[in-house]
């Protein structure tokens, strides 16, 4: 057996130690603006080729059968908070369909609303959006622009005899290192203002209901309760356990109100 010269072994040891040292270096922390820029760059091709990401559920929609007679089909429609919600675990046996796409804003949702909601013929659509608009995921958004998109979603749904549930925007927190950018990009004041508008809108529009997640998930500082999300935005299992019965109650309310 040929032994490796001592100097070669020594050199390789130094190289390996160097790589180990580099691997252990802390990842540079991005500012909120840098994180947002990085997100936009990562989505640039997708947003250019299919801004609404209509292709995401194309095959699933094509395979979906029409609702059975008497079926109370519900579409949960929104961004990542909906996308990562395992509906079958929280609503077993219910004809509930998930059409969330992570990172989306209301202008993107408008583009895919026909394919992912109208054409599926639900009785109810549960819309949870707004947080990424406030963050500026697809560009700066004024509150009045977000509100106009919400109104358009509701009008399209009601024109197709679909009941609308507007979910409140969830609070955010800054209690963990992972949450700092999420919080900095999402003004609590804007979240409150948008929720106030949503509540006022449904009060004057028949066929629309307000689903208040916010009040059940906010702490005494006006932030998302620490134990409901690690990154300050996306609910964990404890968060979804709070949300599920609230959603179920709102769906029951919508269906009951629609009965002749």
PLM features per residue range, with description:
Residues 1-75, 83, 87, 120, ...:
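N-terminal secretory targeting modules
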Residues 39-51, 93-107, 135-141, 232:
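Acidic/histidine-rich helix-loop elements
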Residues 75-77, 97:
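Conserved beta-strand elements of the Class I
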Residues 89-95, 110-260:
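Alpha-helical cap/lid subdomain in secreted, periplasmic
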